[in-house]
Regions:
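Loop-rich catalytic cores of soluble enzymes, especially ATP-dependent carboxylate-amine ligases
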Residues: 92-200
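Terminal catalytic/cofactor-binding subdomain
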Residues: 1-118, 126
């Protein structure tokens, strides 16, 4: 969806404003542009390519998280149907080319786009993911959880690979998002892995 559109066309702006009006979300603006909505301890933000991001509240277990996600998706599906839009939970946009500028008019995204020569902007504009944060009791517990998470990462990528298409064509990868991530952040990730599994 475009950020802004004619009266009879769907847009991200209209979707967020309707969420705020109908379901008691509080709109967040940058200048005159709505860029997010919040409710209690969670929020819906827009990323640079127009991706919607649910930032959930801290919850006790995965079942509470699932209920929160279902509630969010139920509201979103109703509005998307009314606005003639759809939801696609996928790691990389299957048909869109790389846009020249961010879809969403935010100062932060414009600044990142201006640094595009130093970053692969496909990462910000065309990818989506699930990010999970885990509490820890102490430093030893944190290290253990970090190492387990990193060790399981290739298996998780294989289980949830869902981004085989790029600009309408088969990319040759089951998870093009993972391939792009590896290529974009290879040096940082290599150093991080060395630190995470070092003895000291």
């Amino acid at each position: 969806l475009p950020y802004r559109a004619a009266d009879d066309q769907p847009s991200i702006e209209k979707l967020l404003k309707t969420l705020a009006d109908r379901y008691a979300w509080t709109p967040v603006f940058e200048g005159e542009n709505i860029i997010a909505v919040t409710k209690g301890k969670y929020s819906i933000n827009i990323e640079s390519g127009g991706q919607l991001e649910l930032s959930g509240a801290p919850l006790n277990d995965i079942h509470h998280t699932q209920r929160e996600l279902k509630h969010y998706l139920d509201e979103l599906r109703i509005l998307c149907k009314e606005h003639g839009a759809g939801i696609l939970g996928i790691g990389y946009h299957p048909t869109a080319p790389l846009p020249a500028r961010p879809v969403v008019p935010r100062t932060r995204f414009e600044a990142l786009a201006d640094q595009g020569a130093r970053h692969d902007m496909r990462w910000g504009f065309l990818t989506c993911s699930v990010q999970a944060n885990y509490d820890y009791a102490n430093e030893a517990d944190m290290i253990k959880k970090l190492r387990v998470g990193l060790a399981l990462q290739p298996i998780i990528v294989g289980l949830f690979a869902n981004s085989p298409f790029v600009e309408g064509k088969d990319s040759g990868y089951r998870s093009y998002r993972y391939q792009l991530n590896t290529r974009t952040h290879e040096r940082q990730q290599t150093r991080f892995m060395e630190l995470a599994f070092s003895d000291n």
